């Protein structure tokens, strides 16, 4: 379960950076 949380957090961070770049 821990690795799932890590992947989830990494995915959120990546999406946040992508959104910042787009905007």
From Swiss-Prot:
Expression by tissue: Expressed by the skin glands.
GO biological process, one term: killing of cells of another organism
Keywords, alphabetical: Amidation, Amphibian defense peptide, Antibiotic, Antimicrobial, Cytolysis, Hemolysis, Secreted
Cellular component per GO, a single term: extracellular region
Location(s), subcellular: Secreted
Residues annotated with Glutamine amide modification: 23
Summary of the function given for this chain in its UniProt record: Antimicrobial peptide, active against the Gram-positive bacterium S.aureus, and the Gram-negative bacteria E.coli and P.aeruginosa. Has hemolytic activity (5% hemolysis at 128 ug/ml).
Protein family membership: Belongs to the frog skin active peptide (FSAP) family. Dermaseptin subfamily.
Protein name from the UniProt record: Dermaseptin-4
Species for this entry: Phyllomedusa tarsius
């Amino acid at each position: 379960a821990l690795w799932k949380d890590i992947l989830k957090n990494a995915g959120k961070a990546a999406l946040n950076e992508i959104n910042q770049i787009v905007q």
